[in-house]
């Protein structure tokens, strides 16, 4: 949704969900495209000292930011909130009061957000797909592995933005989503 192309509303059901339950947030887009920044495993300040400036540059034009957990410090969420609305879930390293799961509904697309630490072996795509089916979502976004992927796993799109600070592959990364009638995902490498 860029430059007055439309308006959007947000409705949240469920109040404060039990940590095992999913919060449910609904977005309505009228006449435009919604841009979403996706980030995970920032690990400030336990493993990294700062978020690269390139993350803020890439997210400067988004309507919403999703953080898939292992935030580890509330300050990063506050910094991201200066750019856009933020939806975040709790990771295995977080002590913040965040839900374990979130379901976003953007027009007719249901997006599940989890950290992914409940999936073993770590990042197993089949188990992620089954979890997405259980949540009733079209797209499941997770973190935890610090390794990015975009995988159209039969009937569920599986996404992981990797980590912009402590990757487990050579690539530091985030992700951007564009949602209109369909969802398109793009992996964004983060340069130092």
From Swiss-Prot:
Pfam families: Metallophos_2. Its EC number is 3.1.4.-. Disulfide bonds: none annotated. InterPro entries: Calcineurin-like_PHP_lpxH, Metallo-depent_PP-like, MPP_YfcE, PdiEstase_YfcE_CS, Phosphodiesterase_MJ0936/Vps29. Its cofactor is a divalent metal cation. One of its GO terms (molecular function) is metal ion binding. A divalent metal cation 2 binds at residues 70, 92, 115, 144. Belongs to the metallophosphoesterase superfamily. YfcE family. This is Probable metallophosphoesterase MJ0623.
């Amino acid at each position: 949704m860029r430059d007055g192309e439309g308006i959007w509303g947000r409705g949240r059901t469920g109040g404060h969900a039990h940590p095992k339950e999913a919060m449910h947030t609904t977005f309505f887009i009228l006449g435009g495209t919604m841009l979403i920044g996706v980030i995970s495993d920032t690990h400030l300040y336990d493993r990294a000292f700062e978020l690269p400036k390139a993350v803020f540059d890439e997210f400067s034009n988004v309507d919403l930011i999703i953080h898939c957990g292992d935030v580890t410090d509330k300050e990063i969420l506050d910094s991201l909130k200066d750019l856009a609305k933020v939806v975040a879930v709790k990771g295995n390293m977080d002590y913040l009061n965040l839900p374990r799961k979130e379901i976003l509904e953007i027009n007719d697309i249901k997006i599940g957000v989890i950290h992914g630490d409940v999936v073993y072996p770590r990042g197993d795509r089949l188990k992620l797909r089954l979890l997405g089916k259980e949540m009733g979502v079209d797209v499941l976004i997770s973190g935890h592995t610090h390794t990015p992927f975009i995988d159209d796993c039969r009937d569920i799109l599986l996404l992981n933005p990797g980590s912009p600070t402590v990757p487990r592959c050579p690539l530091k990364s985030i992700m951007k989503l564009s949602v209109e009638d369909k969802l398109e995902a793009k992996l964004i490498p983060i340069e130092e």
